[in-house]
Swiss-Prot record:
Zn(2+) binds at residues 38, 41, 57, 60. This is Transcription initiation factor IIB. One of its GO terms (biological process) is transcription preinitiation complex assembly. InterPro entries: Cyclin-like_dom, Cyclin-like_sf, TFIIB, TFIIB_arc, TFIIB_CS, TFIIB_cyclin, Znf_TFIIB. Disulfide bonds: none annotated. It comes from Methanosphaerula palustris (strain ATCC BAA-1556 / DSM 19958 / E1-9c). The gene is tfb. A zinc finger (TFIIB-type) spans 34-65. Stabilizes TBP binding to an archaeal box-A promoter. Also responsible for recruiting RNA polymerase II to the pre-initiation complex (DNA-TBP-TFIIB). Keywords: Metal-binding, Repeat, Transcription, Transcription regulation, Zinc, Zinc-finger.
Amino acid sequence: MQEIEKLRILQTEREALKNRNRVIEHEKKTEDHTESVCPECKSRQLVHDYERAELVCQNCGLVIDDDFIDRGPEWRAFDHDQRMKRSRVGAPMTFTIHDKGLSTMIDWRNRDSYGRAISSKNRAQLYRLRKWQRRIRVSNATERNLAFALSELDRMASALGLPRNVRETAAVVYRDAVDKNLIRGRSIEGVAAAALYAACRQCSVPRTLDEIAEVSRVSRKEIGRTYRFISRELGLKLLPTSPIDYVPRFCSGLTLKGEVQSRAVEILRQAAERELTSGRGPTGVAAAAIYISSILGGERRTQREVAEVAGVTEVTIRNRYKELAEKLDIEIIL
């Protein structure tokens, strides 16, 4: 009877967390719709200055609001230990966990809140409670789908070294696909990989389909097909990937200096103005610009080295670099 009562308490807590989640989402939507456009120039480039408690338009400089609420803590901390000691809350809400991180779990260590070991008499009961609590956290097919897909997203993002904002965006894209029932008839891994590819493009952290396919469990063809489907059905507005977005990562992989990177970006801007990048793969054009820049900057890299980092062939680099050098009147002494 005691176990049944405890399970009822756990279910009640779960319902309370769901209600709290709905309230948080409602408040977030309300906040997002208020003061999202500058009344002077109609720009959406608004910046929150938390030190001055001001909402400022980045385009025209208008101070839209000068008295918004500081949602941060009232205490100050100067290192990680102080922050952990003074914090009275748990981890922030995240879309990368199926329950958004709002639920709790019974720890696997058999110790109480004071750190004392649980007696052998109560360990069997604790084991049963832990088992049922795990089942309650993932109670239906949708949550099981999310739990598996989001863990797969996190695995792929970690393998690619993607930042937190890309992971959150990918999780939101996948959740939208689940809400619109776009998963039916498609593999979870394929949709997760497509969502990650879309998030990379949305956040201007480009990764090629080949790179995504390398860390996923599905083929490049399936990822591309699924990506086109969900982007069309969800109405994702994704601009074509610019070769400039690849330059920092490729230069970092080749250990080139900032001057070489800046020169490569300038070459690509001139090429874009003359429409030399349209209809060509962005990675190949970026690799060719870096190859030219490395020669001009006195940090020569071979075509093979650049090709390995960029994931293209040496033939592609030769064709693109000759074209750029000829059209932009760049004199290269090999």
